Amino acid sequence: KKECNLNSMRILFYCDTVFSFGGVQRVLAEIAKALSGKHEVTILTTDTCTDLSMYGYAESTVRFDSFSYSASSFIERLLCKGYSFLYKHGLPHTRQTSEWYAASFFPSSYKRTLARKINARQCDVVIGVHAFMALHLSAVKSRIRTKTVGWLHNSYEAFFEKETPYLPGLDCFFQVQMGKLDERVVLSHADAGCFFRKMNLCCEVIYNPLTVLPKGRGKKEYRRILAVGRFSFGHKGFDILIKAFSVFVKTHPDWTLEIVGEGPEEALYRSLINEY
């Protein structure tokens, strides 16, 4: 392991989408910019768009390194899909079968690409921004020469226990892979306790920063409701909000609802707005 000079470090964030509207993207920007005042900060991203005007990146020293994964071979895709199906629908979830599933979750050709990119940066620490990126880091842990951190932006319940969880049936795989990382960061002490009790994973707690400082107080005289978030299936509940507001506005016709965000459910929300 390389020794880190805490006074000045090379920090690499690994993230998929950076230049889009979302809570993770905004929080990443605030933390990356704050750290760049003292450290060399680079964001390694698969985002094909670069818009430095977003989130104030243009006024910072944060660097960007964009790349893409080449399509894997037909045989590799077939083997990965085949084992993934077996793991999810038949095999017992043990440490060994979870290790095998890790190979299908993130193919070898992708591992080589990611490890090569990380090693080329010669960084002191690489941080996987949200669960999937952290799982990618655990898959290449033995191939890279740097400390690894998984930064988890969702709760245990959101990953495994909600009606539409992010990682259904993958708790054993998650436990095995996250245990390989040097550190894990969660957003609350409640989450840290839950991951420790249920998975024996020790996590550091770092709260998300305030990314927008409020000015003044809202007043009911404004007659305006604002909702902000990513348009993701089964998690944000904007569809429920639209339906609820359609009931509310019948007795409060001078109120408006504004929803800000983007994501795969935008078309659904627009159709609901037209319907209600």
Regions found by a protein language model. Give the residues of each.
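Short donor-sugar binding/catalytic loops of nucleotide-sugar-dependent glycosyltransferases
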Residues: 17-19, 228-234, 263
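Short His-centered aromatic/hydrophobic patch
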Residues: 107, 128-133, 152
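N-terminal strand-loop element at the rim of the active site
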Residues: 15-21, 38-100
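Short amphipathic alpha-helix
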Residues: 24-35, 49-54, 238
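Membrane-proximal helix-turn-helix segments that form the acceptor-binding/catalytic region
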Residues: 112-119, 152-156, 165-184
